[in-house]
Amino acid sequence: MSLAASAGRGPGTMWSPTHVQVTVLQARGLRAKGPGGTSDAYAVIQVGKEKYATSVSERSLGAPVWREEATFELPPLLSSGAAPAAAATLQLTVLHRALLGLDKFLGRAEVDLRELHRDQGRRKKQWYTLKSKPGKKDKERGEIEVDIQFMRNNMTASMFDLSMKDKSRNPFGKLKDKIKGKNKDSASDTASAIVPSVTPSVDSDDESFSKDKKKKSKIKTLFSKSSLQKTPLSQSMSVLPTSKSDKVLLRAGDFQSQWDDDAHEDESSSASDVMSHKRTSSTDQQPNQSNFSLPKKEGLSFLGGLRSKNDSLSRSTVCINGNHVYMEQPEARSEIRESSPSNSPSPQGFRRKHLFSSTENLAARSPKEPGEGGGTSSDRRLSDSSTKDSMKSMSLPSYRPLTSGDNRESMSPANVEAARETKDSKKQESKKSSLLSLVTGKRDAAAKGSESEPLPTVSEKEKERKGALVEAQLREEDLMRRPEKDALPVASQWGSSLNPFEDVQISDPGATTESRSEPKPPVPAARVPQTKAVKPRPHPVKPMNTTATKIANSSLGTATIITENLISEALMKKYQPSDPAFAYAQLTHDELIQLVLKQKETISKKEFQVRELEDYIDNLLVRVMEETPNILRVPAQMGKKAGKM
């Protein structure tokens, strides 16, 4: 069976076949046994005890055609001569089928497969002469054409070798196996890679010795037991382990969510927000609520910038033109926008709230303001301004610059542009003071003249005209500066002098009323340019640049919506238990990293095993191409299979 035993016997005997395929093609010169010189012939193919019969070729004129094949397994030691002659002999018998009685004999031929394999090689097709039965007189019986092909089936050879090796033909061998503890049912260490072993690993009493320990003395091999435990790795390296890998079932209860505390805080804050929309503050409590003292930093929630509901700035109210605006509802919309890197409430955030709270009043009163600017008489404007000043002193006594038009421009100035705004505001104040000096000087002279002697009515009319001209110039300058200021941030339209946290100091209501009444002259006609000079924008709400405010509000709104959507998705996204991602949704970052590393290691091991299998298949394909390349070809005509008898 070994290659070394068959070496040196010709080019065709370098390998030992395991199977032989016999194809009976046709016959000629057969004797006629039927009516009209015909015969119903069929052939019987036999190797050892296996027999196959072809189909019957009816009414053939001595030349039937079958083209049927049969495959036989050869004994393992065919080339060494140890097999019996009958096991290595191919017998071909041609018979005539009889309707009644036994079939009639037409001829027979015998082929020695060992000699054919040694002399002819792998495949041979030739005509063989049919002979009579042994002990009978030879007659002319014709010939039969047979195609004989030797093959080697690696799987059968490997299994056959294992079965022969495990059989103990010697009684001393059986005794030796019992002493060594070798069991008949135990798997062999030399198991083939083609047939992977599914037998589990046995104990140390049932294991066999390695080749190195067989070289030791007989006493040690007979009475010593190996301490090694047999594993599936002692088989071929190409065999994948059949044991299943341990699977870890992850559950949501094994891990604690880090969003639970934040979810409870969000629910409590939303509940308190709904309950805090009641108007319970009176006009006496409003000045205390609009206090400018900065609150202390309180505990921050998950986002890091949300203020608590007890914050005085978030609960402050503003009275604009007699309409009370409460700051609880706008805060819920601008929570994400107020989360700044400083992580603490600031006056900038307070002024940012006024922008959202005063947009409705701006939209309602903006078309009415231009008509109120210059279309009324001086007496009517004085009465309106006095009533408005009284309302302002009641609502915000210490925050006059904010009520004079700063509510609609409540965006906080940037730290980078603070110096630039202060310079612009100083320039504007210097120009306004120069214009005011001209007006007040003339007004003081008019006051002195009125005390000494009454002036004619013509001089009073001229002063009114001059005051109107100065007022028109101030309006033109404001209109010219407005597009330049709109290009800057919204908060930079007014100088730093109008910022209540920089220039305005908190004072009592009485002091503010006295300071307001001091610059008023006794002449009622000259009060109009004076009030216009001190307050260039007398109304708290004036028409704004609609395009700039729309762009700013739209950009802020879209940014807020995007951030709110992202955070809501991060907080509210939940997986169903049937979803495969549910097992990984509650894992932490470190646990996910460990899981990925384990999966990567498992994949690398499987890739190594697949690579070994690919190498084995490549080597096996090379052997097939060398030994039996004909099995890789597609035959032009598939042969018929002979029926087994």
From Swiss-Prot:
Limits of the C2 domain: 1-128
**Native source species:** Mus musculus
Q: Where is this region: Necessary for interaction with RAB4A and RAB11A, subcellular location and endosomal recycling?
A: 581-645
Q: What is annotated about its quaternary structure and interactions?
A: Homooligomer. Interacts with RAB11A, RAB11B, RAB25, RAB4A and RAB14.
Q: Name one GO cellular component term.
A: membrane
Task: Read off the domain note.
Answer: The FIP-RBD is involved in the interaction with Rab proteins.
Q: Name one GO molecular function term.
A: small GTPase binding
Any one of the GO BP annotations: protein transport
Q: What domain of life?
A: Eukaryota
Pfam families, from UniProt? C2, RBD-FIP
Q: Which residues form the FIP-RBD domain?
A: 573-635
**Which SMART domains does the UniProt entry name for this protein?**
C2
User: Where does the protein end up?
Assistant: Recycling endosome; Cytoplasmic vesicle
Where Phosphoserine occurs along the chain?
186, 204, 208, 236, 301, 316, 340, 342, 344, 346, 357-358, 383, 434
Amino acid composition bias (Polar residues), ranges on this chain: 282-293
Basic and acidic residues composition bias: which ranges? 171-187, 378-391, 418-432, 459-487
What are the cysteine partners in each disulfide bond? Answer: none
Q: What is this protein called?
A: Rab11 family-interacting protein 1
**What the protein does?**
A Rab11 effector protein involved in the endosomal recycling process. Also involved in controlling membrane trafficking along the phagocytic pathway and in phagocytosis. Interaction with RAB14 may function in the process of neurite formation.
Taking the first listed entry, what is the main subcellular location of this protein, grouped into a coarse class?
other
Family matches, as SUPFAM superfamilies? C2 domain (Calcium/lipid-binding domain, CaLB), Eferin C-derminal domain-like
- Which intervals of the chain are annotated as region Disordered? 171-215, 259-296, 330-545
Q: Which UniProt keywords apply?
A: Cytoplasmic vesicle, Endosome, Phosphoprotein, Protein transport, Transport
Extract the PANTHER family matched here.
RAB11 FAMILY-INTERACTING PROTEIN 1 (PTHR15746:SF22), RAB11-RELATED (PTHR15746)
